[in-house]
Amino acid sequence: MSNVQTSAEREIVDLSHLAFDCGMLGRLKTVSWTPVIAGDSFELDAVGALRLSPLRRGLAIDSKVDFFTFYIPHRHVYGDQWIQFMRDGVNAQPLPSVTCNRYPDHAGYVGTIVPANNRIPKFLHQSYLNIYNNYFRAPWMPERTEANPSNLNEDDARYRFRCCHLKNIWSAPLPPETKLAEEMGIESNSIDIMGLQAAYAQLHTEQERTYFMQRYRDVISSFGGSTSYDADNRPLLVMHTDFWASGYDVDGTDQSSLGQFSGRVQQTFKHSVPRFFVPEHGVMMTLALIRFPPISPLEHHYLAGKSQLTYTDLAGDPALIGNLPPREISYRDLFRDGRSGIKIKVAESIWYRTHPDYVNFKYHDLHGFPFLDDAPGTSTGDNLQEAILVRHQDYDACFQSQQLLQWNKQARYNVSVYRHMPTVRDSIMTS
């Protein structure tokens, strides 16, 4: 009778690890990843401290911090190649890798150092792309499809991908293809009432898909159903934690700095994932995103920029608000120095649903506060996508130094996995 071991009891495996990381504001950073096996039960309890680099001036506003944990099956990355790989077993063809640049930090966006061969597993790169495309880009933006990390520009490879500003009137507009009018042809001297109702119904379903259903799962949800994350190869969001990072002002006490003060931000955090059953081989990825609220001393209320106020602008008439089509405005209508060429489409009377922040213009004359010096998009031309994505360069003047970039984090990721795996002793004592 053979004594070859062919199975193992399900035991707990401690995969806890420390992570010392840093990044740029507004860029999506992988802070931890764990490969998992079919049948695993995964638990995560992350604790640590997040710091901003030393601020040049006193602490003015808190920053918004988001942590996300996703599960991505390898099948979503490799497709049929993965299925054949598992069928063939030890005789399977090796899975491909992707090419990185030769610099050690050019795979930082997926939370690893570039190995000596300048290649990393494809599942790390493609899983990050899938997460970004499904959750962190506006649906009307083009997908990121770079085949290799070496195809990324230097900032994206080192500092990760740019994300949108926190939502407000100018950073979350309607899709650019939004229609402002809809026409229906009719026969002379007559109106087809039934055809008119049908046209209304068709317009309604088109608008629903344009504004709220640009992804398959949203369409199915509108029918009262739901889709598995497998339906569109979507990474599964397992847990999301968000909080505001606050701090304190430090007064200078020595002779050279007496009377001066600067801001310090240190925020402890906890991000926990309850026990999650892993249905098939894949990777658990935890990502962080830190952003300041987008505030500009040159922003003003939409009504303040209107030289002639109409009834529709000011009255807030429910009959008009509920029936008028979206309105097209420009950044010039919202910022003193806004570009008139950046057009956005917004719901009618959106200025009665939101209100801009106000900053005294004296702040504009001072450097070092976490405010946008210019209207978004001023330096990038009439490009709406560039305007609503965070530029970390806009916040460079806030920090005394960026030796650890704009934020840094020290954390312990307490990871426990219940897994069918022989003990180390069994692996050493072959047969």
From Swiss-Prot:
Keywords, alphabetical: Capsid protein, T=1 icosahedral capsid protein, Viral genome ejection through host cell envelope, Viral penetration into host cytoplasm, Virion, Virus entry into host cell
Compartments, record wording: Virion
Coiled coil regions, renumbered to chain: none
Keyword Transmembrane: no
Record GO biological process: symbiont entry into host cell
Summary of subunit composition and partner proteins: Pentamerizes and interacts with H protein, G and B pentamers to form 12S pre-assembly complex. By binding with protein D, induces joining of twelve 12S complex to form the procapsid. The procapsid has an external scaffold made of 240 copies of protein D, 60 copies of the internally located B protein, and contains 60 copies of each of the viral structural proteins F and G. Upon genome packaging, interacts with protein J. The mature virion is composed of 60 copies each of the F, G, and J proteins, and 12 copies of the H protein.
Protein name, UniProt field: Capsid protein F
The encoding gene: F
